[in-house]
Regions:
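Interaction interfaces in information-processing and related assembly proteins
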Residues: 1-230, 298-304
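Cys/His-clustered metal-coordination modules, chiefly Zn-binding fingers
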Residues: 198-304
Length: 304
């Protein structure tokens, strides 16, 4: 069964997207060995990125979310594309903090709110990425993403995200939903939507009780006669490769490659998102760089 759905109200004025991201967050926890609080923080960001990525119009488009709040967890990053793949990382995955007075994990303090949320959109039809940036509201992720839509894209949006972590640090459930109002929404529709969402249990309560993204849609859009537009599977999937990593090294330029070679001719690159390791002989890379440079020079100034 697909873990993400997109829906629309009967009159076309309200868009809904919901996801059960439990398996995504479980894989992230396994890869990064996160503490409970960091699992919640990174899991929320991955879930939010998944929801945003589902709105991309082209499979080759990408969104990168970067949260730098000055908290002990450090910088959090999540990347997603139009095909349902998402990946993420966190600077300090082992940071743990006391729970808040209500017993909830203190994600806001771990992330911090003295900083910014940066949203980078790579659109294949544009030469340069579009970058939006807003101050963090709380560091709790959902409020910060909602604020981004309000101030950077001027789209009335509600986003709810949740990650439930067990005592053994395993992920019991994770997910979220996003509701957006299209132009022309009436005050009555806005009031009804607010009442619906305020009356809903939390995302983790719903998922832990066996509810689905479609169930969340029916609750959030009660009275709007929503219909499911489409559904698909979302996965934690890193797109790194030996070839892409080699191209990244070559792009550093000859001087940097020489400096690195002089320190150690054997280079190991570790992916931040999946911890895959790639080994390179820098002498061989320098030879390849020189061959490419010579070929480029010959193409620019061919021998007559």
């Amino acid at each position: 069964m697909a873990n993400l759905i997109r829906g629309l109200s009967e009159n076309g004025g309200v868009v809904f997207c919901g996801v059960d991201s439990t398996e995504i967050v479980r894989k992230a926890e396994k890869l990064h060995t996160t503490s409970a609080t960091c699992s919640a923080a990174l899991g929320r960001l991955l879930t939010g990125a998944t929801l945003m990525g589902s709105m991309l119009k082209d499979d080759r488009d990408r969104i990168t979310l970067r949260v730098a709040g000055g908290g002990p967890a450090g910088v959090l990053i999540a990347c997603t594309d139009g095909t349902g793949n998402v990946k993420g990382c966190i600077d300090n995955p082992l940071v743990e903090l006391p729970a808040k007075a209500n017993g909830h994990l203190d994600v806001g303090t771990a992330v911090g709110k003295d900083g910014v949320l940066t949203v980078i959109r790579d659109n294949r039809l544009q030469k340069e990425p579009t970058v939006g940036q807003v101050p963090l509201v709380s560091g709790e992720i959902a409020e910060d993403l909602t604020s981004y839509y309000a101030y950077s894209e001027q789209v009335p949006t509600v986003m709810a995200l949740g990650v439930l972590v067990d005592k053994d640090l395993s992920i019991l459930c994770a997910g979220g939903f996003m509701v957006q109002l299209l132009p022309g929404a009436t005050d009555a529709e806005i009031d009804q939507l607010e009442k619906n969402i305020n009356a809903m249990p939390s995302v983790t309560e719903l998922l832990h009780a066996g509810k689905t993204p479609e169930d969340m849609m029916q609750l959030a859009l009660a009275g709007f006669d929503p219909n499911v537009l489409d559904e698909r599977d979302e996965h934690y999937q890193c797109d790194c490769s030996a070839e892409r990593t080699k191209e990244m090294l070559l792009s550093l330029g000859r001087a940097e490659l020489v400096r690195m070679r002089d320190e150690d001719p054997n280079c190991e690159v570790v992916c931040h998102f999946c911890h895959s390791k790639y080994q390179y002989d820098l002498n061989a890379l320098l030879a390849e760089y020189d061959a490419q440079a010579a070929q480029a020079a010959e193409a620019e100034h061919p021998v007559q």
